[in-house]
Amino acid sequence: MKKIFFILFIIFSITNSSYAAGSSSNTKTTTSNYDKAVKLIKFAKKYEKKGKIDKANKRYEKALKLLLKSNKKKPNNADILNYLGFTTRKLGDFKKGEKYYLEGLAIEPGHIGINEYLGELYVATNRMELAKERLEILKGCNCDEYKELKEIIDGTKKSKY
């Protein structure tokens, strides 16, 4: 009988300590500034679709600040530059948006997101030939970005962003 209690005690002790090992209250999950910015941009897009432009712009402004920090920490990252271009464009600064997009393309010329968004910027600024150049780069990707930019250039669809 003593052996059974001893064995149960050992099993109980091992089980409790193994649960404790994976559930420390000191566990800290950190989200990067880039990830926070992407989340804010997604919320901004939703607000924009609902016509809540002021709320959308506040999210874009917050995202922009986080992306600038990310860019300082990790310069030459095409994804960060893509979102920097996107947020500045959404906030009405097409010149800065174009600058960020072009910096991103210098790093990764085939970046699908940058090519699409830069094409949309060119359409918005009435530079259709440059938009068509971006479309040509996307031609072989077999992706939604190509189809969307083509429709925007053709005038059959309005840019959602």
For every predicted segment, state its role:
Residues 49, 90, 124-125, 155-159:
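Register position in tetratricopeptide repeats
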Residues 7, 23-31, 46, 132-161:
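Terminal, low-structured helical/coil segments at or just beyond the last alpha-helical repeat
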Residues 73, 107, 138-141:
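Structural marker of alpha-solenoid helical repeat scaffolds
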Residues 77, 111, 143-146:
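Residue-level recognition of tetratricopeptide repeat
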